[in-house]
Amino acid sequence: MEEMRLKLKAVDARTIDFTPYGKLFNLRAEGEGLCYSCAADYTGSCTAAPVIDTLGSLGYTKSAGLPFTAEQMERHGHTQEAQMPESQPIVFLVAPATDAPRPNAKDVKAVIIPKGYVAVLDRGVWHSASHGLYTESYYYWLANVYEGEPTEWQPIDGGPITVEE
């Protein structure tokens, strides 16, 4: 018997209420929580406070583009995680933090994070790895990583989930 797969269409994170998952920062435009600097030959922006509330390791991950299928999602009870696209928008699955031992497919959304944005996921928020919107892609992430840290990967109840454009 063929396995049924839930299919989701990715939505721009700017068009939904992202607060159940964390915060979005637009580093390309002025906004709350950001600082700016400029000179004749550059303009720059940064978050006014640390982007995560713990010490963090900076990571760089390569992943496939859309479509992708996720059988599991991860959560971090000990740290927030910031994700930043490199050369193209990124897409990942996200579900609110709960006391449940696994993410439930009915709670999962596929979100697009545009270039120039940072998505900061709260502790306990379920998420997949990020993928390029168009093709194989790289993204940066920032989280508290150490040997034996309690990140957990769990199967998606009602999954797997395939994400399409």
What are these regions (language model features)?
Residues 1-113, 128-165:
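Active-site region of the double-stranded beta-helix
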Residues 125:
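Short beta-strand-plus-loop segments that form exposed binding edges in beta-rich domains
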